[in-house]
């Protein structure tokens, strides 16, 4: 059974997430100076920023990353700090009502938020290789990996619904 601990993101939590973003960015740059690979964009930052921008409640328990308070919809979020590409994985037991994708433009410190219009059932039909769908791989107990940018955002011409300007701490609905 899923444990839920929903939190409304107030101004203080939003500002803490923005501060954490800039600390992550600085640490990531230091690490990339001596290693090929940087640090993944922390979900504690991306999920908080998503909730602040969209009015969702952050789930600090299990069973989805957030909740839409009016409809009780379970929100799953995935994020990338690489604007051009991503590799995302989903657990075999994913269950959500709406998938949101967060795409970070590090150069300009802007986070773009996309409502993919996809739920966990829709996700199962996405072709992840020549012979299998995401659902096929989940049924085998695997964590399928694919690009949300390529297979969902670009394939369906999805535009962002919001932008977070991290330098100015502005949230803009698009």
Curated annotation (Swiss-Prot):
EC number: 3.1.21.4
Pfam families: RE_Bsp6I
Keyword Nuclease appears in the UniProt entry: yes
Gene Ontology molecular function, alphabetical: type II site-specific deoxyribonuclease activity
UniProt record, GO biological process: DNA restriction-modification system
Annotated catalysed reactions: Endonucleolytic cleavage of DNA to give specific double-stranded fragments with terminal 5'-phosphates
InterPro entries: Restrct_endonuc_II_Bsp6I (IPR019037)
Keywords: Endonuclease, Hydrolase, Nuclease, Plasmid, Restriction system
Domain of life: Bacteria
Name of protein: Type II restriction enzyme Bsp6I
Organism: Bacillus sp. (strain RFL6)
């Amino acid at each position: 059974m899923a444990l839920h601990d929903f939190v409304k993101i107030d101004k203080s939590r939003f500002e803490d997430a923005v501060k954490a973003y800039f600390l992550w960015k600085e640490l990531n740059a230091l690490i990339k100076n001596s290693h090929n690979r940087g640090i993944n964009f922390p979900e504690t930052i991306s999920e908080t920023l998503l909730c602040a921008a969209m009015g969702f409640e952050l789930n600090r328990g299990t069973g989805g990353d957030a909740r839409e308070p009016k409809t009780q919809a379970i929100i799953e979020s995935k994020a990338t700090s690489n604007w051009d590409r991503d590799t995302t994985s989903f657990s075999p037991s994913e269950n959500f009502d709406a998938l949101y994708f967060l795409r970070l433009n590090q150069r300009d410190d802007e986070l773009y938020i996309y409502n993919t219009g996809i739920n966990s059932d829709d996700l199962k039909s996405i072709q992840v290789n020549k012979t299998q769908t995401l659902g096929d791989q989940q049924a085998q107990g695997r964590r399928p990996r694919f690009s949300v940018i390529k297979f969902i955002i670009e394939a369906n011409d999805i535009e962002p619904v919001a932008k977070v300007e991290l330098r100015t701490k502005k949230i803009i609905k698009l």
